[in-house]
Structure formats: structure tokens, C-alpha cells
Amino acid sequence: MIINGFKSNLEALSSPVLSPPRSFSLTAYITVFNDLAKPLINSLIVVIPTAFISAFLGAMGAYFFYTLSYSFSKFSSTISDLLFSLIALATFIPYQATLIPLTRLIVSMGILDTYIGIIFAMLIFYIPTGALLMSMFISVIPRSLIEAAKIDGTGDLKIFMKIVLPLSMPGFISTLIFIIIQSWNNFFIPLILITTPNMRLVSVAVQSYTGGYGTLYNDTFAAAMIASIVPLAIFIFLGRYFIRGLIALGGGKGV
């Protein structure tokens, strides 16, 4: 993908994919970067708040299920299991099944073609994902810590902010990374909810390089490479935190 971005369109089409270019050219990368600068900014504006809000609210939801599951009331525990099952099922609902009613809702709210509208739509899908992932990390926190804090008169919000969230921080970072990657690569939601070219996200903008009356293959390879910069950077610089989160999940034991 990187190599073919340095080729001319004819060479990218006719030469083997892994063959080095006969003459290096930055024309494709420069042209594509100028075209994708705005979509890249749009994606960052949408993805960053989506990931943080989804992970944070998902963590709060996971803590709510955690406290219900350890309640002295058998009814509360049953309700917790039922709600958690519904949240888990929600993560398997395909985007296509809900985009029509979701689009109607966003149009009626007057937020179509806005950052708020696309963030709102993504939150609907990624908050359940955040709750599902964070529940696995919060469930290994010793129950005795929560009970001791409650005996001292600490409220649930303070327990969550001062005890639960810090102890589950590896899981929070792992969830954050996962949602960033998923929302960055999301294609269907921005394709349906954004109609103005100036508001396009990078996932939709890259698709515009194919089809039509022809395909400039060197530009397509360059666009795919530029669009992958953010996910690659996250894995390079934050990948170790993702691994730590998985290790913490595998090594933790509830009390």
C-alpha cells in the first residue's frame, strides 16, 4: 500500500503490487493529503469525543450492573442480569437495521449534517460496547473495597470516580482504543448521516477514490495509507496499554 502510493497510476496498475516503483513520486500523496485534510479533521472532531464519552458512560453503566449483581436483593441481581443481557445483545444489532429510524430521529432533531448529529448516532452504538467491555474489567474489582467505602458513607459517584475508575484504568484505556479504531473505520453511519461534502469523514472520503468513470490506483493506495495513519499511530504508541489491559483482565480475580 505504501509502495504503490509512490508510483504513477499506470505503473500501479500494470506492475506487481510488491514491486518497488521505477521512479519515486510524491504527487499522489501530496494531492490526496490536500483532499483528505478536511475529512481527517472532521474524523478527529467526531471520533475523540465519541470514544471518551462512550468509554466513560459505558464504565458507569458497567459499575451500575456490578453493584446490582452484588445486591442483597435477589430481584435486583436478576434485573441486573437481564439489563446486561439486553446491552450485550444491542452490540450485535447491525447498523443497517437501525439507520432508517435513526436518520428520521436525527432529522426531526435538526442535527443532520452536523458534528453533534454524527456523534449522537455513534454514541448510540458504542456506549453499549463500552459497557460490555468495561464490565469485564470492573467485575474483577474486589467487592470488599466497594463495601468498605459504602460503610464509610461514600456515595456511588465518588466510589466510581475515586476507586472503580482508577482501578479499571487499564480496561478503560483498552476500551478507549477499541472504540477509537471502530469509530474511525465506521463507514455506514457517516455515509448516511452526512450529505455535505465539506462534512465528510475520512472513511467516506477514501471511498470516493474508487468507482465513477475510473480509478486512480496510486491515489487510492495513498488515500488508504493516509487514512490509516491515526489507527497505526494508536497501535504504535498506545498498543502496550491495550496489552496491559488484557493482561490485567486475565490476571484479575474478584473477591
Could you say what each language-model-derived stretch is?
Residues 1-255:
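A structural signal for multi-pass alpha-helical bundles of membrane permease subunits
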